[in-house]
A protein has these predicted regions:
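Hydrophobic, membrane-facing alpha-helical anchors
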Residues: 121-135, 150-160, 178-188, 284-291, ...
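Core alpha-helical transmembrane segments of integral membrane proteins
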Residues: 146-249, 321-323, 327, 332
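Alpha-helical membrane-inserting segments
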Residues: 162-167, 183-192, 208, 212-220, ...
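Structural signature of hydrophobic alpha-helical transmembrane segments
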Residues: 165-180, 229-243, 295-311, 351-365, ...
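Membrane-interface helix termini and inter-helical loops of multi-pass transporters
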Residues: 220-229, 287-301, 404-415
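C-terminal transmembrane helix-loop-helix hairpin of multi-pass membrane proteins
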Residues: 233-238, 249-253, 257-272, 335, ...
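Generic multipass alpha-helical transmembrane bundles of integral membrane proteins
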Residues: 240-245, 268-350
């Protein structure tokens, strides 16, 4: 590699790895006959790309193990949120590597392509050279957002609009949340595209959503005499920030005793929630907004169920698009979510079941449906399950907990926080037990 290229790499805080330098340039030796260093570069890079997609430690390790088995290598892997440490043994030599990614996120489209790569590796890539494999991985690694910031803003608008109805909001709150969430996520995706830091993009996008909701509500008050009671929907306008993937994958990792990955993902999710709710609370104080209860919609049970099915579908579809899922994958997740979330809500309303066990039942249903569908279309299970239950994450409860902490209403704050924690625990539990029931490789500790 030229000196100027190395200079460009070294100017970054997270230096890029010149993967092609580890492959033989003569093109005569296939990867299964190559040296341990070259094999380790392929195994490590596959794990690193999987990690960058937002998937959990179990899936990352499984993918690396499958490649190792084909290449005749023994591999031990320790996975975190942002880094992988692994050792490769071939009976003679040992290679230890520590790899890290510059930023974390969710990209289900890239994850799907990587799972296809791993599935096809014994039949295709195992018969290529290391250089040829790295070229294919270059193509996959360059799969970025398949949607423009405007479309991602629209997806957030649809998701939060549907979310508003599912939380009890009416048409006015839904319209205002649609506008505010759309603009807020548009700003967020623009900031992410320009690589601004996590805290900044959360603070700016959440503040923008709250301000836009309040501004449009004020315009509606002056132009159409809309009562100020509809200010309650401002919470829904910022729910696009909910860290559904790290919340759920942390639970799955903890279930498999991948404590490092599980705790790091949980910490990452908590950071996002704390920063988002703190800035939302500050904006609420500045704009004089209060998280009041929604007005009763007075819908018949049958109509309410039909609307819940429809809104759950669009809510999950929007979130799935935000996770960079192709439209067919997003529609599949939305179908699962519409059934699972409507079941959860109906269990609470019709049977009086507490919210946490109802959330467990909804997540279990989503997991079972996703496992059944995966057998037919091959979509990554996590790309279907997480979007389908992210609308069950109690973002409203978490915000109200922080809001009440801020105004020193400690009794209310603890009540909201306890309710949120119980639901947050129940959601990954539902997916975990669905996985235990349907996946024999997940059922055992090793």
């Amino acid at each position: 590699m030229a000196d100027n290229s190395y200079t460009d790499i070294m100017e970054k805080n997270h230096m890029e790895i010149p993967w092609h330098d580890y492959a033989r340039q003569d093109g005569n030796i296939l990867i299964d006959k190559a040296g341990l260093i070259e094999k380790a570069s392929v195994i490590g890079r596959v794990g690193l790309i999987m990690l960058s997609c937002g998937t959990g430690a179990w899936r990352v390790r499984t993918s690396m193990n499958r490649l190792s088995k084909v290449l005749g290598v023994t591999c031990t892997v320790d996975v975190g949120l942002m880094s992988i440490e692994f050792n490769c043994f071939d009976g003679t030599d040992c290679i230890s590597q520590s790899l890290s990614i510059a930023n974390t996120g969710v990209n289900t489209s890239k994850l799907y392509r990587m799972e296809q790569f791993v599935d096809n590796f014994p039949k295709e890539e195992a018969h290529l050279t290391g250089e040829e494999i790295h070229r294919r991985l270059d193509e996959i690694e360059h799969i970025h957002a398949i949607y423009s910031p405007a479309r991602l803003g629209l997806a957030a608008a649809i998701a939060c609009c549907a979310f508003t109805f599912l939380l009890g909001g009416g048409p006015i709150e839904m319209i205002l949340a649609f506008v505010a969430a759309g603009i807020g996520n548009l700003i967020r995706t623009k900031l992410i595209k320009h690589h601004f830091t996590l805290f900044l993009n959360i603070a700016v996008s959440i503040s923008a959503s709250c301000f836009i909701y309040a501004a449009f509500l004020k315009i509606a008050e002056m132009a159409f005499n809309v009562p100020s009671i509809h200010e309650a929907g401002y919470i829904c306008s910022m729910l696009f920030i909910i860290p559904g993937f790290p919340f759920i994958t942390s639970g799955i990792d903890l279930a498999k005793l991948d404590l490092r990955s599980g705790l790091e993902r949980l910490a990452y999710a908590i950071i996002i929630v704390m920063v988002a709710t703190m800035f939302a609370w500050i904006m609420a104080l500045l704009l004089r907004l209060q998280p009041m209860d929604f007005e009763d919609l007075n819908l018949t049970p049958v109509l309410h169920l039909i609307l819940r099915l429809i809104m759950s579908f669009f809510g999950v579809f929007g979130f799935s698009i935000m996770f960079n899922s192709p439209a067919p994958m997003a529609a599949t997740a939305a179908l699962i979510g519409s059934i699972a979330n409507s079941l959860r809500l109906e269990l609470v309303d019709l049977t009086g079941m507490p919210a946490p066990p109802a959330a467990f039942a909804g997540a279990l249903t989503a997991g079972l449906l996703a496992s059944f569908i995966k057998q037919n279309n091959g979509y990554p299970r996590i790309s279907l399950t997480v979007p389908s239950i992210v609308i069950m994450v109690p973002g409203l409860y978490l915000y109200r907990a922080i809001y009440n902490f801020g105004i020193m209403a400690l009794s209310d704050a603890v009540s909201w926080f306890a309710s949120a924690i119980m639901i947050i625990i129940a959601l990954p539990l539902g997916l975990i037990f669905a996985r235990i029931l349907t996946d024999k490789t997940f059922r055992y500790c090793t």
